[in-house]
Amino acid sequence: METLDIKIALDPVNDRAVLKETKLKRKDEGALIIATNGESRIVDAYEAQEIMDKLNDIGHGEYMGDSDYIAMMNGDKIINIGTGKCFIGSVIIMKFDGRALSMLAGDEFEKAAAEFKSRLITLVCDGQEFSALELL
């Protein structure tokens, strides 16, 4: 997004208008980044788009139950276990209405996090326990 910086001081030599590129973001809107270890953060639309661009060729999406929330992750990092597939790491969660992705807002961050956490399973390897997202 560009903004216009106008400086007028009744000085015909130095008065000017300059286009400046800025990144404005809404505090109440964004995408949720959440990891299987419980850590999370909210990213703005610009960072969400950068992540989605990087996931373009390697991404895998999973709906979070019957909700409109979809978790997108690096599909190359999905692992097979005896009973199915799972993912360990972080995902980006946005809404999908069947046509387009959109940002989360308000209490949707908590709802999306709860949906994500409800799909975590505990795996054990060499005596070490860790959480993983169970995939359908």
Regions found by a protein language model. Name each.
Residues 1-136:
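Short beta-rich binding modules
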